[in-house]
Amino acid sequence: MKVSLFVTCLIDLFYTNVGKATVELLERLGCEIDFPEAQTCCGQPAYNSGYIKDAKEAMKQMMRAFADADYVVTPSGSCAAMLKEYPHIFRGDPEWEEEAKRLAAKTYELTQFLVNVLRVEDVGASLPGRATYHTSCHMTRLLGEKEVPLRLLEHVKGLELVPLPNAHQCCGFGGTFSVKMGPISEQMVDEKIEHIEEVKADYLIGADCGCLMNIGGRIGRVGKPIRVMHIAEVLNHRN
């Protein structure tokens, strides 16, 4: 099965290990990985900031880059959700509406692709320790996904998975929200860390690098001994 990988801006710039883990995991499961070099930002930051014209140019480039893809897989619920918004954004556009529909239909967040397309829940991962999972807003509210990541994590050997109190509460990142509403964002992420400490987790796992950057950055600043990992890194981990 040929898979075209959309790496996202945060992975490309800050979390290259997540991209590497995604490739290794998919290849181990028998996928042939293609990386369209013409891919760019999905347009979400510009779109959410009101720069619609600029955002649409990025979106058009994404549609060109992945035009020949069979499956588009990304280790990001947020960016996958944005690609699935393209049909709404380009509704009524005679040139781009159908392209937007095609890209949206073949786009999958990584864990959804593993479970719903490859039909795999146990990927052979192992990671000893106690972990809790942060559910990102876009993963649940836009993609409507709550259970698939947990089903995969439940099969990781040696990993004790404990529920996170108020798991569906925003971590305070919210893209530009954390910039525009800094003090509020800081209080939100502090509350999130309190809940992580409450369950005595060794690991905080998530599926969106924006959340992990926000939570992990704050954990580092306050000096808490909690390791932050993307779910792709966990699923690719072998002892």
Swiss-Prot record:
Superkingdom of origin organism: Bacteria
GO molecular function per UniProt: oxidoreductase activity
GO BP term, example: lactate metabolic process
GO cellular component terms given for this protein: cytosol
Protein family: Belongs to the LutA/YkgE family.
Record's function text: Is involved in L-lactate degradation and allows cells to grow with lactate as the sole carbon source.
Protein name according to UniProt: Lactate utilization protein A
Gene this protein is translated from: lutA
